[in-house]
């Protein structure tokens, strides 16, 4: 992806995205190529998967334990996913019974960033719909 596409997708000023990319490069989370495309490094991919993990675990918590509807939890999870404590996230996962999917049916990466890939769409559909049918 390039800076222009990223700024359109995020609905941000290109200068803002350029500054964000600069900071990500400093942290070695992204690299840019000669054609100006931006790609996650392995470190960046792992970091992204861990954020996705936190986000999806929080969505499960909000739906299962606090009785939010599955379509209400995304913005709340956006805020909660930035909690830095790995121990808290591990305890949250254990408290939730090690769920494999979020309320939308998307797989939750494990603490090593691995995603279960051998899941058929029917099982994902059933899992996702069990949340809001309760």
Question: Over which residues does each language-model region extend?
Answer:
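Basic, amphipathic "hinge/linker" alpha-helix immediately C-terminal to the N-terminal HTH DNA-binding motif
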Residues: 36-55
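Amphipathic alpha-helical dimerization/coiled-coil segments
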Residues: 56-100
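Mid-protein regulatory/catalytic core that forms ligand/cofactor-binding pockets
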Residues: 82-134
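Alpha-helical residues within the helix-turn-helix
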Residues: 8, 25-26
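Short, hydrophobic-biased segments on the C-terminal half of alpha helices
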Residues: 18-22
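N-terminal helix-turn-helix DNA-binding core of bacterial DNA-binding proteins
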Residues: 1-12
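A short, conserved structural fragment
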Residues: 26-33
